[in-house]
Amino acid sequence: MQIREAILSDYKEMMSLYNDFVGEDRYSKLDNDSFSDVLNSPNNFVFVAQEQQKIVGFATFSVRRVIRYKNPIAELDELYVIPEYRKRGVGKTLMEQVLKKAKELNCYRVFIESQYKHEIGHKFYEALGFKNYGYHFIKDL
C-alpha cells in the first residue's frame, strides 16, 4: 500500500469514495475546479491510500491560525477507508501521515470532528492518542 498526496487526476475516483462516505447530495456541488482549488491551496492537504492502482482510502486536513494559539492548528476534515480495507491499518497509516505533515508544519494541535454516534471512529481516534475534548455546533448558511 502506498500513501501519497492526491493529484488532480484522482478527482473521479475520490468523488466516488466521497459519495460512498457521505452520500451524493452532500457533495454534489464539489466539481473538478473545486477539487483543484483544494489541492492547490497551501492550507489544505489530501492524502490517498492506494493499493494496486486503486484508491482505497483518503484523509484530508486543513491548517489555520487562531488567536488563542501561538502556532497553527490542524483539523482533520475527512478520513475514509473503503469497507473491504478496514481493520488492515489503512486508516492508521493515513492518520500517521496527517500527523507527520502537521508536525512538519509546526502545528500545535490536531482537532477532529466526529458525529456523536460514531463510536467505532471514537475508539479509533482514542487508540491514536486523541481525547474527547468537547462539543461542536454547526449551522447551515
Name each region found by the language model:
Residues K92, Y116-G134:
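Conserved active-site alpha-helix within GNAT-family acetyltransferase domains
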Residues M15-K29, I67:
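Helix-loop element at the rim of GNAT/NAT acetyltransferase active sites that forms part
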Residues M1-M14:
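A short beta-loop-alpha structural element at the N-terminal edge
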Residues V48, K54-V63, Y80:
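Conserved beta-strand in the GNAT
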Residues L79-R86:
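A short, internal acetyl-CoA/4′-phosphopantetheine-binding micro-motif in the GNAT/acyltransferase core
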Residues Y27-V46:
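Active-site rim helix/loop that mediates acceptor-substrate recognition in acyltransferases
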Residues K103-E113:
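Conserved GNAT acetyl-CoA-binding A-motif
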Residues K87-K100, A127:
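Conserved acetyl-CoA-binding loop-helix of GNAT-fold acetyltransferases
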